[in-house]
Amino acid sequence: MSPALVLDTGALIALDRNDRATWALLRVAADDSAIMQVPAGVIAQGWRDGARQVLLSRALRHCDEAPLDGQTARVAGLLLGKSRTTDVIDATVALTANALNRTVDTVILTSDPGDIKLLAEALGSPIRVETV
C-alpha cells in the first residue's frame, strides 16, 4: 500500500511541468487508491491559468482539497511561531500531513524540504518528506 501524499506548491509545479518522477509517484498512489491531499493555499500558489495548466488540472482531479479555515489558520500561526518559520502555506502542508499521519503513513512531496522538516519537527511528527 502506498503512503498518503500531501503535495506542496513545488510538487504542483513539477506536475504542471510534466516532471516524470513526480507523475510516477502520483500514478502509483492513484493505482493504490492512496489518499492524496493538497491544501487550498497550495492550489492558490500554483494555479495561474486553468486553460493552460491541463496537466495540473488532471493531477488535481486525483487529490482531495484540504480547506484553509479560521481554525487551521490559527494553528498554522502557532506552528510558525514554534518552528521559527514564516510560510503560512508550508505550515498548512505540515498540518495536513500531520493529521493524516495519525492513521496512515504519510509523505510530503515538496521542493522545499528544509522548512517542511522544521515544521514537522515542531509538530513532533515523523512525517516523511520527499524532494521533487
What residue ranges belong to the model's regions?
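Alpha-helix/helix-capping structural signal
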Residues: G10-A11, G41, Q71, G114
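Acidic, PIN/NYN-like endoribonuclease modules and their adjacent C-terminal/linker elements
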Residues: S2-A4, R102-V132
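Short, well-structured N-terminal submotif of metal-dependent ribonuclease cores
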Residues: M1-V38, Q45-C63
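Acidic catalytic patch
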Residues: V42, D64-R84, A91-L95
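Residues that scaffold the ATP/ADP-binding catalytic core of kinase and kinase-like folds
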Residues: L15-D16, A76, L119
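Acidic, metal-associated active-site segment
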Residues: G46, D87-V107, S111
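Short, hinge-like loop/turn segments at secondary-structure boundaries
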Residues: Q53-S57, S83, P126-I127
